[in-house]
Amino acid sequence: MYPIVRLLKDAVLASRQPRLAPLDTHVSRHHCWPWDIDIWMELNNGRTLTLYDLGRTMLTLRSGLAGVLKREGWAVAVAGTSIRYRRRIKAFERFEMKSRAIGWDDRFIYVEQGMWKANGDCANHALLRTVVTDKNGIVAPARVIKAWGLDID
């Protein structure tokens, strides 16, 4: 089940936070709820990816990319993910998630995300290769970055 309540809550919170520059970091705070856990009473790996999806969504809202995507008729997709699980997040534990775009090449925009425990330990860390598409296929990141308002010259 997709966490629609969490999505709505995060969207409301993100709308009340200051706008981010394109390469700034979105920080959100979460709890590991019973519906997030696996049989070992810790955050399920699949739910981790879902929470990262929510973090990227809020990043696009706060940075203004969501408006650019809507205006241009573009969509975003994850083309690849590399994730490292380092520490367990147990049921009811609080954690912080950080999401930021870190760069791009001629086809992809790269996003870094991490979940951090209250004691400062990195619970998991992901590097995502994302792509912006339109009806004709992949949109060049330079075009996206320019529409997003970042001067790349």
Protein language model features and the residues they cover:
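Hot-dog-fold acyl-thioester-processing enzymes
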Residues: 1-77, 134-153
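HotDog/MaoC-like acyl-thioester-processing domains
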Residues: 1-16, 89-96, 100-153
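Generic, ordered loop/turn and secondary-structure boundary motif
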Residues: 36-38, 44, 86, 90, ...
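Hydrophobic beta-strand-centered segment that forms part of the acyl-chain substrate-binding groove
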Residues: 59-103, 125-130
